[in-house]
Amino acid sequence: MINIRKTHPLMKIVNNAFIDLPXPSNISSWWNFGSLLGICLILQILTGLFLAMHYTSDTMTAFSSVAHICRDVNYGWIIRYMHANGASMFFICLFMHVGRGLYYGSYTFLETWNVGVILLFATMATAFMGYVLPWGQMSFWGATVITNLLSAIPYIGTDLVEWIWGGFSVDKATLTRFFAFHFILPFVIAALAMVHLLFLHETGSNNPTGISSDADKIPFHPYYTIKDILGAMLLILTLTLLVLFTPDLLGDPDNYTPANPLNTPPHIKPEWYFLFAYAILRSIPNKLGGVLALVLSILILMLVPFLHTSKQRSMMFRPISQCMFWILVADLLTLTWIGGQPVENPYMIIGQLASIMYFLIILVMMPVASTIENNLLKW
């Protein structure tokens, strides 16, 4: 009898994606982050669902409903902090996953890469709206500042902002719709993740060498299932340590003050995973210019496949490109640091230089480095 997993209409889909899938024999731990992102998403949807059972999306009660979850609901505090810190773990995995794609040339799978960039945008939008829900000071002012950026769009800007707000300022209507969107978007992300996998399985995985691995494939199960379980255990361990020992390490103390439209916090800043983009936004004195730079800082990822000038796919055997990549990583860390600092010298000038460097590395230095390497190899 033929195995049921290969014949059953539903089970054969799972089988072809997670069991009998032929995978390269040499993919490293950098290939674990895809499955970790899946785990993060499931965890966020589950914890979010339980939070939504007790949360109220009204300006008068939102803050106290979160306090109620932490104080009165059975294990509410752990659910709340797993959700908040789970978002941080999600973004750590996302940045690692994108970095892996950049380093090993996985962006040459065009459809997979572009769906991935859309996933990144969707996740950032979801996280932003989630940050508004506790209705603390940073929630309110973060929402005000970021939604206000849309007013920089010529002609329709002001109308667009008021349409998103549902009034003339961030208020009850804004909070209610943000809750609605924050609830629905993770399911959109889950659907997009399936499309992402669908496109990936059309081509098969890349590997560290960037060379075709068709001649040497191994089944996904048991080799990569056991490897993914190890990654998952490390992820859950890290998250548990964060939640149980320092749950507020990555949060902002200002968000423990209820939202007050009459009192602006001294330093308005988003969560740590948006600081690099926030630094790029602030480094341009012009409002529209800043908004464009902010969007382009992520959208530029879609250009990367067209800027690939090397005759090799991966950076594994390209030392000059490796240097460029790690300079880019250092630059992003610098931008993250600057995004959390006040707008004054020397931070302003450092932020401006780091922003210029960011675009310069991706648009100019990396393609030039690749061309130099091609010439060194006499290709």
Curated annotation (Swiss-Prot):
Gene3D superfamilies linked: Cytochrome Bc1 Complex, Chain C
Molecular function GO labels: metal ion binding; ubiquinol-cytochrome-c reductase activity
Annotated heme b b562 binding sites: 83, 182
Keyword Heme attributed: yes
Keyword entries, A-Z: Electron transport, Heme, Iron, Membrane, Metal-binding, Mitochondrion, Mitochondrion inner membrane, Respiratory chain, Transmembrane, Transmembrane helix, Transport, Ubiquinone
Transmembrane segments: 33-53, 77-98, 113-133, 178-198, 226-246, 288-308, 320-340, 347-367
Annotated localization: Mitochondrion inner membrane
Membrane topology: Multi-pass membrane protein
Residues binding heme b b566: 97, 196
GO cellular component: mitochondrial inner membrane; respiratory chain complex III
Free-text cofactor note: Binds 2 heme b groups non-covalently.
Major localization class: mitochondrion
A single GO BP: mitochondrial electron transport, ubiquinol to cytochrome c
PROSITE patterns hit by this protein: CYTB_CTER, CYTB_NTER
Additional free-text comment from the UniProt record: Heme 1 (or BL or b562) is low-potential and absorbs at about 562 nm, and heme 2 (or BH or b566) is high-potential and absorbs at about 566 nm.
Family, as annotated: Belongs to the cytochrome b family.
Quaternary structure and interacting proteins, as annotated: The cytochrome bc1 complex contains 11 subunits: 3 respiratory subunits (MT-CYB, CYC1 and UQCRFS1), 2 core proteins (UQCRC1 and UQCRC2) and 6 low-molecular weight proteins (UQCRH/QCR6, UQCRB/QCR7, UQCRQ/QCR8, UQCR10/QCR9, UQCR11/QCR10 and a cleavage product of UQCRFS1). This cytochrome bc1 complex then forms a dimer.
Protein name: Cytochrome b
Species: Ammotragus lervia (Barbary sheep)
Gene coding for it: MT-CYB
